[in-house]
């Protein structure tokens, strides 16, 4: 838990507020933050958007992006992070989309992330794809921790 405490400390020190946009992790990132005293100062909101329709409806992820790049893609993660920033008052957003089990398109454990930050009036976005091993539960836990621990 110390690593998540460091994330909360970092956000407090830098006076940043966070929103999460989670698909595969189903709210685990926000839940991990909620375990830490003082998280209420830095956690603005969390979006759990598992289905394509929820991604579109709540975060304005374009169906065309989903169709072209697939649900497990940095492009979708980027639109999720930007959508979460736009739908909240947070300064930074982290998003996750991926697969915990093998499917027709992607190997189980493939996780895509995006981090969006407000810099004045501009949004800056970076993204990455990471591969985790283990069963469904282990992959989701690793994915949630990774998404948060990349912030500081």
Where do the language-model regions lie?
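Short alpha-helical segments enriched in small residues
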Residues: 1-152
């Amino acid at each position: 838990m110390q690593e998540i405490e460091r994330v909360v400390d970092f956000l407090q020190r830098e006076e940043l507020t966070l929103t999460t946009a989670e698909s595969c992790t189903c709210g685990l990132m926000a839940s991990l933050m909620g375990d830490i005293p003082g998280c209420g100062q830095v956690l603005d909101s969390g979006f759990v958007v598992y289905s394509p329709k929820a991604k579109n409806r709540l975060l304005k992820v374009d169906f065309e992006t989903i169709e072209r790049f697939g649900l497990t893609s940095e492009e979708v993660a980027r639109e999720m992070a930007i959508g979460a920033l736009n739908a909240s008052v947070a300064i930074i957003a982290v998003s996750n989309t991926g697969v915990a089990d093998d499917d027709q398109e992607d190997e189980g454990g493939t996780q895509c992330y995006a981090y969006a930050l407000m810099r004045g009036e501009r949004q800056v976005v970076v993204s990455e794809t990471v591969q985790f091993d283990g069963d469904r539960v282990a992959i989701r836990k690793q994915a949630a921790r990774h998404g948060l621990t990349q912030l500081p």
